[in-house]
Amino acid sequence: MIDTIIPSTPRSAARAVTADELAAADAVALETPYLFGRRQPDTTRAERGRRAVTMSAVVAHRFGPVMTHSMRNRRLSTDDWVPALRRTFEDLGTTFLKFGQLVGSAPGIFGDDVADEFRSCLDTGPPVPFDEVKRLIEDELGRSLEDAYAHFDPNPIGRASIAVVHRATTHDGAEVAVKVLRPDVERRVAVDLDLLQPLLAKVVEATGEQAAVSMLQQFDGFRQQLGEELDLRNEARAMVHFYRLLGLVDLPKVTVPEVYPELSNRGVLTMEFIEGVPVDDLATIDGYGADAPIVVQQVVQAFLLTALRWGTFHGDVHAGNLLFRPDGRIGVIDWGIVGRLDADTHLLFRRMIEAALGDDTAWADIAAIFMRHYGEAIEAALNLDDDGLIAFIKMMIQPVLTAPFGQVSLADMMLAPQRAVAAASGIDADDTSPLTRLRRLNEQRKARKLVVTQGAVATDFDRATFLLSKQLMYFERYGKMYMSDV
């Protein structure tokens, strides 16, 4: 049993969570919050048609020059289609921008160059008139804005593609943040999703590249994630759940905003306002005078505890969602995405950590999990038997296990076998020899077949590994900032 998530060092604030604390937290963890599953509304032909006209014009504008160039060069290169797709997403906004953000945050899945290109996609949106915000809140809460809040700032403190956030004060004097879904956002997202999937399928057919296939494979999980985000009761329940859970283990530097259920509903979420700066704002944090490495280490410990022991975790821990507070604590905000590990991903993560702690028996389990999910690809690309696979996985993963935390890449550790398989069967994009052209055409045919026959849908294991590895990459960055010597 992994009781101490991060081994203690002379200056470490990491601590062994006691058996009593774990027992109490286990009871709460079993009460995983019910999700209000929201199926996107059915869209009309007219809605799809209007949006398709806009999308077609944007695609023609962005991909026209690219296709002309590819016809001259007899191939569509990554340097051509990736920037064109990113600009297309930026022009179309809303759902497309959110998908672009997903690509930009996952170099382990899409490759460093592709992720770098999409990193400029910012999830933002236009202002919502205050009268409209007021109407939305009053419709959701069934009372006037003045009855709900003593003061409500009409100027938003945050504007994303699906919601806006305002600051307010309750009649009890509490400072709160109020998240409000944009008007008609569900229908706009539903129409976009109906058109995004065919667009990604066309990109796969045109390029045959693994990065394009990976985008299409992540679409189903993206659709599911948006369905959860469009009902703020899901986020409220997740916050209450983790607030209780982390309150039972002694990690005092980690805080979750308190939810005000009487001021929350499907389209409105009222929560404690957290004053702070993003965890990567080193200059401001240094001025707070807190021992930042100790604080960040407890956040990492909290994340690993929830993911390793209970298989659930915050699914979007970018720096803006980890607010370093002036009092030396970190507030973890924006619980719209919560990761839930399927049984195999949960076991894989635990066994990898146990392998890192010296359990040699873990490698056979790790190899067996990868064989279950990637057996055919491993056999075709690497031609390894069971013993060879175990040795290969150890060779890929073991070097990172003895490095200081700030130099460890847990995400690379999770994704190493998949990357190696892809590399072993990959094609040099810069090679224009006749043989390589033939191989590229063959890969394109395989990609088209995947789209037509299977829909290129990722498994629960793929999606869970993807979401977990994304968060680990963020924590690696914070580790390099604050704990490179731990």
Residue ranges, per PLM feature:
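Conserved ATP phosphate-binding architecture of protein kinases
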Residues: 163-171
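Core structural elements
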Residues: 91, 95, 159-162, 262-273, ...
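N-terminal accessory/targeting segments that precede structured cores
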Residues: 1-164, 187-217, 223, 425, ...
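ATP-dependent phospho-/nucleotidyl transfer catalytic cores
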Residues: 119-126, 138, 186-191, 197, ...
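Glycine-rich ATP phosphate-binding loop
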Residues: 167, 175-182
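Helix-rich C-lobe and terminal helical cap/extension of kinase-like folds
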Residues: 18, 34-49, 73-75, 79-80, ...
